[in-house]
Curated annotation (Swiss-Prot), chains A, B, C, D, E, F:
This is Phosphopantetheine adenylyltransferase. ATP binds at S9, F10, H17, G88, V89, R90, E98, W123, E124, F125, T126, S127, S128, S129. One of its GO terms (cellular component) is cytoplasm. Substrate binds at S9, K41, T73, R87. SUPFAM superfamilies: Nucleotidylyl transferase (SSF52374). Its cofactor is Mg(2+). The lineage of its organism: Bacteria, Bacillati, Bacillota, Bacilli, Lactobacillales. It is found in: Cytoplasm. Belongs to the bacterial CoaD family. Keywords: ATP-binding, Coenzyme A biosynthesis, Cytoplasm, Magnesium, Nucleotide-binding, Nucleotidyltransferase, Transferase. The record marks H17 as: Transition state stabilizer. Its EC number is 2.7.7.3. Gene3D superfamilies: HUPs.
Length: 158, 158, 158, 158, 158, 158
C-alpha cells in the first residue's frame, strides 16, 4: 500500500496540476493533495477555497483526498504516514529547484522521499502565475483550468 | 513579405536589445518593436519615453517602427497583422521561460509563431535590470546602452 | 522577400522535422530544406533517398524546395542567397549545441543569421536516432513519421 | 499494491544504482530491476552476469527481483504488469534525456508512467562509464560499487 | 602570492558558504570575505553582524579576513588588490547567473577574473533564503549553519 | 604560492584553450598545462606534437609549463604538487560534465580541488572537434587557433 502526498500552493489548481494528480492517483494506492499555507506569501484564494476547488475537480478519483496544512512539509509527511512526496517537473530549471527542496525535506526528515512526474508536454507552458496574468489582461484561459476554476478566477480578477 | 514583432518592456533599451533589432530588421521585411505596458509592474521610464528612445536609436533602420501597447501580445499579433514574434535568448534558462511564453501565446492565438535569435555573445551579460543596478551603484555603463539612454539613465537614477 | 534554409541530416525526416518545415514555410516567403551530406558519418538513407522523401511529404507546401549539399552550411547560405538559417530547439541542451553551431557559422560567414523555432511539445520526444532504435526493436512508430517514411524505415531496418 | 520497474543497462551496477533501488524498494510495494539487453551496444558484462551481480547485492531487499529482457521497455511494462517505471536523475541534462525516453515509452504504450528519483548527491558524480574508465587507468573505485562488482571489474579490465 | 575575494550578502553565512571559504583558503594564499551591502535590498542581519559572524566562524583560518563594503565589486577588486573573485556554483542555473555577473564585473574592470568552485554536493540544497524560511516555519537547521548562526537566527526569527 | 594544473586533450590547442591558459597564468603563480594521454581514444596529433604546439604558443608566459601524462589526473595532481585543477566552462552542460569529473577526482584524491573559469564569450562556440570538422570541410579557421596550429591542422587534414 503506497501513500503519496502532492504538496503545493495550488493558487488556483490548473489542468497541469490536475494531470499530475490523475497520473499519481493511477500510480499510487492513495494520494493526498495538500494545500501548503504560506503566511509569508499573499494568495488570491483562501486555503479553504483552494481545498474546495481541488476536492470538487477530483471527486471522481476515489483514492484522492485533499486538505490544507500550515507548517513544514517534512512534518506533514510523518503526520500523514506518507511513503512519498510527488512533484511535477517541466524542465531542467524546475528540477534544480525541486532537487533543492527535496534535499531540504530529506534533511529535515530522513524518511521523506520525493519522486518527480514529468509534466505532460501539453501543459508545459501552464503555471498558476502565468494563467492569473492572462486573466488580468483579459485573455481566455478556457481549457487551461477546470471550468469551475475559470469562472471563479474571472470574477475574482475582474 | 514577412512582418515581425519584437515585444518587451525595454525599460530601457540596451545594446543587447538593439543588436536583436538590427539582426531581425535584416532578416525580416518589416519589424515593429512593441513596448508592452504592464500595469502590474512599476517601470523606470514611461511607455512614451521608452518608445521615443527606441525610435531615436533605430532611426537609421528604415523597416523598423515602434509603438507601445497594453493588452495581450497574442491580440497585438493579430492587430499588427504580424507573421512572427521575435525574442532574444542567451542560455537554457532564457529558453525555458521563452518556451512557456511562446506556448501560452500560441494557445491564446493559434496564428502566433515565435522564433528566438541567439544573443550576440558580446551582450550575453547585459540586461536592463543589471544595468540599472550598476548605475545606482555609480558604475559606468558606457557602451552597454546607446548614449542617449546612458545620459537619461544617469539623470533618472542620480 | 525572406528566404530561409533548414539544414540537417534528416536521416530520415520525422514529423518533428515536418512540423518545423510547415511553420517555417508559414513564417518565411521561401524555405529550402537542405540535406547536409556528412561523409564522416554513416547514414541509413542515401542523400537522394532523403531528398525524395522530403520532397514527397512537402509537395503541398508551394514555397518549400529541397536539395542535398556537401560542404559548409556557411557557404551554402551564400550560394542559396538565403536570409536566415532555421533550426528547431526542444530544450536548453539543444540550445547550447545550436548556439555553438550558429556561432561557428557566423564566424565563417558574417552574413549568416540563425533563428530557432521552439519544437511543438507534441514532438518533443522524437528524434531520428530514437525512432530508428524503436524500429530496430520492433516497436511501432505510426504517427511519428510520415507514412511513406514508416514503410521505408521498416523495410530498411527489418 | 504498486509495482515498479527500474530498467537500465547496469554494466555494471554502481552504488548510485543501488541507492535508487533501495529507495524505490522503500517507496513501492514491488520493484523489478530489468537489465535491458541492447544488441546494438557492446557491453563489458553479459546480461546473466549483470543479473547475478544485481541479485546478489539486493538479496536483503525482499520486494526486489531482477531479470534481463530484450525488446522494448514499453512492452516489458505490460508483460510485467507494472504500474510505473523508475529512473534516477542527477541534473537538468539527465532530465532532458529521460523526458524524451519517457515520452517515447508513453507513445508506444499509453499505460506507461515514469517517475524520476533525484540521485543522492553523494553519488552524483558516479556512472558506469566513468567508473570503468577509472579502473582502466588503475584508479581505486572502492566505495563506488559493491565489493563483488569491484573485484569482478578489476579482473575483467586488468 | 594570490589574493582572492569571496563577495556575497551572507545573510547569514551557511555551512555551504563556509565550505567554499575553507576550500578557497586552501587554494589561494589570501582570502577576503566581503559582505556586499545592497541598500536596495532588506536584510535580516546588519552588515556588522554578518561580518562578526563570518569572522568568528573563520577564526581558525589564518589567511582569511572579512569586511563589509558598499559599492561595486569591480571597484572593491582594485581597492583590495585582489587577483581573483571566487564564487560557488551548484548547477547550470547558478552558472548562468554567475556568468552574467562575472561578465559585467569584467566589463566594468578589465582586471577582474572570476573562478567558480563547485559546491560540495552535501550542501547542494542549502541557501540562506531556504534556511530562513525553514526557521520561520519552526524547522531545525542544526548542521546547516554554524551553531552561533543557528542561535542568532532562531532568536531573530522567533 | 599557488600552483594550478590545466589538464585536457588539447587535440589541438584552440584560442579558447589559450584564453583560459592566459587568464589562469594571471591568477595563479604557476600553471602547468597537462596533455592527458588517453589510450582508449584516437587522437589527430601525438602527445609530443600537442606539447610542442602548447609550449610554442605559450612561450611568452613565463609561469606556464607543459607536459604530457598518462594515468589519472588525481595522481598527476599529487606528483605535480598542485594546489588546484583549472577547467573552462561555457554553459550549464559543460558544468554538469565538469562537476562529475571534479567529483570523481576528489573521490580518488581528497586533496584535489577544481575551479572553473568562465570561457570568454568570444570563444564560446569553439571546440577542438568542431574546428577539425570545419577544416575537413574546407572552411577557414583563421583566428580560431594559433597560426602554427592552423598550418599544421590544414596539412594533417588535407
Amino acid at each position: 500500500m503506497t501513500k503519496a502526498l502532492y504538496v503545493g500552493s495550488f493558487d488556483p489548481i490548473t489542468n497541469g496540476h490536475l494531470d499530475i494528480i490523475k497520473r499519481a492517483a493511477k500510480i499510487f494506492d492513495e494520494l493526498t493533495v495538500v494545500v501548503a499555507i504560506n503566511t509569508n506569501k499573499s494568495a488570491l484564494f483562501t486555503p479553504q477555497e483552494r481545498v474546495n476547488l481541488i476536492t470538487q475537480v477530483t471527486r471522481d478519483l476515489e483514492n484522492v483526498a485533499c486538505k490544507s496544512v500550515t507548517g513544514l512539509t517534512a512534518e506533514t509527511f510523518t503526520q500523514e504516514k506518507a511513503d512519498v512526496l510527488v512533484r511535477g517537473v517541466r524542465n531542467g530549471e524546475d528540477l534544480n529547484f525541486e532537487i533543492q527542496v527535496a534535499g531540504m525535506n530529506q534533511y529535515l526528515n530522513q524518511e521523506v522521499e520525493t519522486v518527480f512526474i514529468p509534466a505532460n508536454s501539453k501543459w508545459e507552458f501552464t503555471s498558476s502565475s502565468l494563467i492569473k496574468e492572462v486573466v488580468k489582461m483579459g485573455g481566455s484561459i478556457k481549457g487551461l483550468v477546470p471550468e469551475t476554476v475559470e469562472v471563479l478566477l474571472k470574477s475574482r480578477l475582474k
